[in-house]
Swiss-Prot record:
Xref: CDD domains: RPS2
Record family assignment: Belongs to the universal ribosomal protein uS2 family.
UniProt keywords, alphabetically: Ribonucleoprotein, Ribosomal protein
Protein name per Swiss-Prot or TrEMBL: Small ribosomal subunit protein uS2
The gene coding this protein: rpsB
Gene3D superfamilies, alphabetized: Glucose-6-phosphate isomerase like protein, domain 1, Helix hairpin bin
PROSITE patterns listed in its UniProt record: RIBOSOMAL_S2_1, RIBOSOMAL_S2_2
Any one GO CC term of the record: cytosolic small ribosomal subunit
Sample GO molecular function, one term: structural constituent of ribosome
Originating organism: Syntrophomonas wolfei subsp. wolfei (strain DSM 2245B / Goettingen)
Amino acid sequence: MSVVTMKQLLEAGVHFGHQTRRWNPKMATYIYMERNGIYIIDLQQTVKKFDAAYEFVKSVAAAGKGVLFVGTKKQAQETIREEASRCGMYFVNQRWLGGMLTNYKTIKRRVLRLKELEKQEAEGAFEVLSKKEVARLLNERERLERFLGGIKEMDKLPGAVFVVDPRKERIAVAEARKLNIPVVAIVDTNCDPDEIDYVIPGNDDAIRAVKLISSRIADAVLEGKQGEQITT
C-alpha cells in the first residue's frame, strides 16, 4: 500500500503547480495537464515517487544517520520545525547560512558558542554582569538560537537532506550535492528535478501540501528508527 493516497494529495492541494509562464521544461514529465493558466501535477507519479522517497528516508534513519529538514519560506517554517522535532531530527527554517554543510566545522563552533551561552545563563553567570553586557549576550544567544537552534544537536553531517522548494533553497541543495549527501525534495513545476536525488512532484506553496508531505517524511524517520532499535 502507498504511503499517501491520491485522495489525501488532492485534499491538500498537492496537484496545483505554478502558472504556465513560470515553469521549468524539465518538469514536463510530471505534469498532467494545464488548467486556467496553471499546471496540474500528475499525482499518480507523485504517489510512486513519494513511496521511493519514503523508503529511502526510512533506510537512512534505520542506518542511524540524521536527516536535515530545510524550509525557510514562510509557508514551510512552522511545519519544518514541528515535523523535524517530532521525529527527533534537525532543521533549518529561518535562513540558510552559507557553509552550513560545506563549512560545518565553522558552523559547529557557533553552535558550541550557543550552548556555552545557554549554560552560562542557566548557571547564573549573567547575574554578576552589567545590564548592558547581559543584554548583549542575550541578543547574541537569541540570534544564534534563531539560525542554529535546529541543528544544535547535529554533531555530524546528515545522511540526507529534505527540502521544501529546492529553487529557494538552492544553496542548501548545492552544498549537499557537493558533499554527495542525497537530497529529497518537494519539487514544484518551476524547479529543476535534475538536481534532486528523490523528487516528490508537488505544490511547495500551500501550507497543507507542505504539511502532508513533511509529516510523512517525519513518519519515515520514525519508522526507520524503530527498525534500527530492532536490529541493534
